[in-house]
C-alpha cells in the first residue's frame, strides 16, 4: 500500500532518471516558463479511476501516468531524438514497479506526438502513457492552511454582502 501519491511520483522520477542514462532532466510537474532546458521528460499523474475490487474493503486505484518527452526542434537530429527518448521511456516503464507495492507498468495507447499542450507548441513533444494499480493509504495528510473560504449566493455577493456569507467550515459542522 502506498502512503501517498508523492511516494509514487518520487519513485517514478528517480527510476526514470536511473534508467535514462545521461538524461538529467526527468521531473514531475516541471514549471514550464518561457524557455526550458531540453531534452526533458516531464511526468504527471493524469487520471485516477477505481481499480479492481478484491472484496477486502480497500479501494484500489488505477493511476494513468504520462511522460512528455520534450526536445528542442532546432537541435540536429531532433526528430529522431524525440522518438528515441520516447522508446527508451516505454522500455523503462514496461513491467516496472519502481520498488513499490503496485502492479507492473503497462503501456496504454500508443506513444505519439502530443499536440495538446499549447505551452509546449514551440518544441517537439511526444506522449507516453502507462498505468499502475495500487492501494493508497487511508491516512490523509493535513493540508496546509489555505485562504478563508466563504460561501455566498448570487446576487448577494461582493464586499458589500460580506456579512451575509456563510463560513464553509462552520456550515460543514452543521451550523448556519
Q: Residues of each region from the PLM?
A:
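A short, hydrophobic beta-strand-centered structural micro-motif
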Residues: 37-48
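Charged, amphipathic alpha-helical segments and their flanking helix caps
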Residues: 1-31, 48-176
Amino acid at each position: 500500500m502506498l502512503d501517498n501519491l508523492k511516494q509514487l511520483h518520487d519513485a517514478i522520477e528517480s527510476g526514470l532518471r536511473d534508467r535514462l542514462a545521461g538524461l538529467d532532466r526527468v521531473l514531475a510537474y516541471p514549471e514550464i516558463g518561457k524557455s526550458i532546458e531540453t531534452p526533458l521528460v516531464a511526468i504527471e499523474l493524469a487520471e485516477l479511476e477505481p481499480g479492481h475490487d478484491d472484496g477486502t474493503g480497500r479501494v484500489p486505484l488505477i493511476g494513468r501516468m504520462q511522460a512528455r518527452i520534450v526536445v528542442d526542434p532546432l537541435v540536429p537530429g531532433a526528430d529522431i531524438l524525440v522518438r528515441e527518448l520516447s522508446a527508451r521511456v516505454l522500455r523503462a516503464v514496461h513491467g516496472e514497479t519502481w520498488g513499490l507495492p503496485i502492479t507492473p507498468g503497462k503501456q496504454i495507447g500508443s506513444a505519439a506526438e502530443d499536440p495538446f499542450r499549447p505551452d509546449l507548441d514551440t518544441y517537439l513533444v511526444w506522449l507516453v502513457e502507462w498505468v499502475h494499480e495500487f492501494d493508497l493509504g487511508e491516512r490523509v495528510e493535513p493540508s496546509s492552511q489555505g485562504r478563508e473560504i466563504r460561501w455566498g449566493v448570487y446576487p448577494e455577493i461582493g464586499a458589500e454582502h460580506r456579512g451575509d456569507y456563510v463560513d464553509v467550515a462552520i456550515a460543514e459542522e452543521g451550523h448556519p
